[in-house]
Amino acid sequence: MASRIPQFNQQVLYDTTPLPDSIPKVKELGASSAPLMSAAYFIGARCRDYNDDFMQCKNENPGKGEFECLKEGRRVTRCARSVIADINKSCLEEFRKHWTCLEDNNQQLWQCRPAEWKLNKCVFENLGLKKEIPDQPPNVTPVHLRKQMIYAHWPIPRSAEPFVPPTQTGDNNKAPAAASSSS
């Protein structure tokens, strides 16, 4: 059949060529899938503009956008890194409980709603970031605020209440300045 003998190289190859100086240097996130999933909506809330720029660059350079979009990708990484660092500073206990629950439950969000509600409350109060599902119809209860989960292994305790951030006009990703008691 073939005239040459197949040769398999089992060594890992590293490309040691440095990136050009025009590409900004950035440290990687250093987080596994569970912490990233736990913080994903908050990363999306704060880093939306960077994500949109990156996706626009990828769409404008189909099939060859890897090198052209490195700058935008580095901005996304830097922003996500800042969100993870801020959550670790402000809400470490709640964050750790939530991502550990995700890790223990095969990354199934519905198994960890009570821990998620506590994390959402802490992040909103300390960082002003809200968990919002994009394109959610206004007349439908978001899945993360439902008190009854169909596929959950155990029922949500009656004492657990979902955190619903106060509604406000304008920018939905900022914490309210001061709660005024008008009623």
From Swiss-Prot:
Cofactor (UniProt): iron-sulfur cluster
Upper classification of the organism: Eukaryota, Fungi, Dikarya, Ascomycota, Pezizomycotina
Family: Belongs to the complex I NDUFA8 subunit family.
A single BP term in Gene Ontology: mitochondrial electron transport, NADH to ubiquinone
Disulfide pairings: 47-79, 57-69, 91-122, 101-112
Top-level division of the source organism's lineage: Eukaryota
Placement of sequence motif Cx9C motif 1: 47-57
Keyword annotations from UniProtKB, A to Z: Disulfide bond, Electron transport, Membrane, Mitochondrion, Mitochondrion inner membrane, Repeat, Respiratory chain, Transport
Assembly notes: Complex I is composed of about 40 different subunits. This is a component of the hydrophobic fraction.
One Gene Ontology term, aspect cellular component: mitochondrial inner membrane
Sequence motif Cx9C motif 3, residues: 91-101
Name this polypeptide is given: NADH-ubiquinone oxidoreductase 20.8 kDa subunit
Organism name: Neurospora crassa (strain ATCC 24698 / 74-OR23-1A / CBS 708.71 / DSM 1257 / FGSC 987)
Listed InterPro entries: CHCH, NDUFA8
Job description of the protein: Accessory subunit of the mitochondrial membrane respiratory chain NADH dehydrogenase (Complex I), that is believed not to be involved in catalysis. Complex I functions in the transfer of electrons from NADH to the respiratory chain. The immediate electron acceptor for the enzyme is believed to be ubiquinone.
Cofactor remark from the record: Binds 1 iron-sulfur cluster.
